[in-house]
């Protein structure tokens, strides 16, 4: 399954930020690369990161699914997600520590779904992408 880590596209991110408002860089990447049915995972401890929220809004407009990982309140990202996993903490470092087992659980669930013993004959239809922020 193809996956793209938006923050790791350093040359695009820095070039965009040189000429445009950097809070739109992830939204622009989702607009250009995302397809209906793809999944965007938006991670923001407060849920209020403008760059993540704008990417989520664009993803929804394109028919993508949006999963948010936030702290207790969910912030603005809560309303821009199909599913928002909220770590039950308010302090940044505690939220980030609680996000670690969530990432690993999501990865294990994907591996089991796509590559588990009962799914060895799984065939992929339309190309789908998993987006990480």
Where do the protein language model's features map onto the residues?
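Glycine-rich phosphate-binding loops that contact phosphosugars or nucleotide phosphates
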Residues: 1-120
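Internal, active-site/partner-interface "lid" segment
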Residues: 114-133
